[in-house]
Amino acid sequence: AAELLQRIEAPEIAMSLLEEDDYITRGFAAQSLAKHENLHPKFAEDEHHSVRIVAAENSIDKDLISSLMEDKHSSVRRMAISSAAKNKLKLSSKTLEAGLLSSDPALRSLVASLAVTSGGDVLEKACKDINPKVRKSIAETLRLEVTEVDERIDLIASINPEIILRWLRSRYDPKSSALRWNMIENTSLNSRIRSKLIEQMDGRNDVDRQRLAIISEDSSILVKIAADNLSSSLDE
């Protein structure tokens, strides 16, 4: 009967099978009833993770998803975080911070994408994560969701400028250009990042030549070479 539910809709049968002792049967029944939002809390309380994961995958209730993000089983936690990200749920800072404490970088990278939306202290914590998966997730979410310089971009630039280096590629609006120059002129920044930011202006005809002339005298060889190359290309 359980396998039959995969092929036909039979909610009455599925409801009765939810009470079975066999977790495989309950899992099939839960999958069959996945669209019934009123049953998600029941699935979430099931003793077996294969039933709880159905709630994690299908619920858009932020409180239920928040509780499932702290589930004892990693696959349920991952699914809950994935659902929260997919449905752009506005979760509390406390819930997101708990997610960032996970030992699993794949989970932390999902939480980090939500942190971009929320900003503030949670985003600051996510940006301090040294795992490349987490950093890539932040960069990708920024690329897709953030179209202009705002307080989140300024915050990330101060903590993890490498991420903003990627975001600034192909962005030449006034705010982006101002941020790029501020980072180039910040001598406490990594020379490689500063030189890459200069290279981003190659081919542009709106480069501030006065600022470029000053940067050409920089103490960093990398920055000086990048500035000289840009200056030469402008003169061609």
What residue spans do the PLM features occupy?
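Structural detector for internal amphipathic alpha-helices that build alpha-solenoid repeat scaffolds
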Residues: 1-8, 16, 23-35, 42, ...
